[in-house]
């Protein structure tokens, strides 16, 4: 919400189970060899489960194991002196940063390399807003479309379409349109007297200027590349910076945004 500082509070509830003491009869049971055998079998089953190799696990078991392993990972902020204990998460990385001060309130593996996928488009939008104008024209070249594969996020834009930068950013952020993100980068780069690669260079330089040290961006839409990576801390710094742009906040407040067919030609 513009003009207001937003604070997200995580409330941890601790529930105590209390058993009240009430009068009851005392019952003694004879030792049960069957029960002992069942207990031994259960213990053996538990040991077997623990020793089960990953290659023998089903996809569901592998997913569950990955979640459990992630949950057990260290939360760095829990070791800070006089700092509240944060909750566990099933994600391998997590961060909470105060957008006003940049203070980190919660940290879990925040410098670990991760593939950013479509959140790359947040940085793409930041560079577009920094170097472009919302009224600029964005023309879709063959390069903006040719890499698209079936199933890729798209707004259905075609080669030769011409829309405004504002419309292209709506498509990039609301529809996560990969062709729109590419077109934004290509056109903003050209309007600055350069090209798409210059735009990617600005993405990396901007990240470093904000204090990012563990990122490398090679495209504007986040489609997978082994050399395209970031970390939670760097993305939080990028998010904090773009929070200063009211145009970005306006776009993010919308649930849908129509682009008239007449505007694409």
Go through each PLM region and give its residues.
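Sec-dependent N-terminal signal peptides
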Residues: 4-16
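A general structural signal for well-ordered secondary-structure junctions
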Residues: 17, 134-135, 178, 213, ...
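Sec-dependent signal peptide cleavage junction
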Residues: 19-35
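Active-site-adjacent loops and short helices of periplasmic peptidoglycan-processing enzymes
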Residues: 30-35, 41, 45-233, 237, ...
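Extracytoplasmic
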Residues: 234, 239-265
């Amino acid at each position: 919400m513009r003009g207001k500082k937003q604070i997200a509070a995580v409330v941890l509830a601790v529930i105590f189970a209390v058993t009240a003491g009430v009068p009851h009869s005392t019952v003694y049971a004879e030792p049960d060899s069957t029960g002992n055998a069942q207990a031994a079998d259960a213990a053996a089953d538990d040991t077997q489960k623990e020793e089960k190799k990953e290659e023998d696990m089903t996809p569901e078991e592998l997913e569950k194991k990955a979640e459990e392993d992630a949950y057990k990972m260290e939360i760095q902020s829990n070791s800070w002196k006089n700092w509240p204990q944060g909750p566990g998460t099933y994600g391998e990385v997590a961060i909470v940063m105060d957008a006003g001060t940049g203070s980190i309130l919660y940290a879990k593996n925040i410098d670990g390399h991760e593939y950013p996928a479509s959140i790359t488009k947040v940085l793409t939008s930041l560079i577009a807003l920094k170097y472009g104008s919302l009224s600029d024209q964005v023309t879709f070249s063959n390069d903006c479309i040719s890499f698209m594969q079936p199933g890729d996020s798209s707004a259905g834009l075609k080669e030769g379409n011409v829309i405004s930068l504002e419309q292209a950013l709506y498509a990039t952020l609301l529809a996560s349109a990969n062709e729109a993100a590419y077109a934004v980068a290509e056109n903003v780069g050209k309007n600055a007297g350069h090209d798409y690669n210059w735009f990617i260079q600005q993405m990396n330089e901007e990240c470093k200027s904000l204090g990012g040290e563990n990122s490398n961006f090679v495209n504007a839409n986040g489609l997978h590349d082994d050399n395209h990576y970031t970390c939670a801390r760097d993305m939080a710094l990028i998010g904090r910076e773009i929070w200063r742009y009211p145009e970005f906040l306006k776009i993010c407040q919308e649930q849908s945004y129509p682009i008239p067919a007449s505007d694409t030609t």
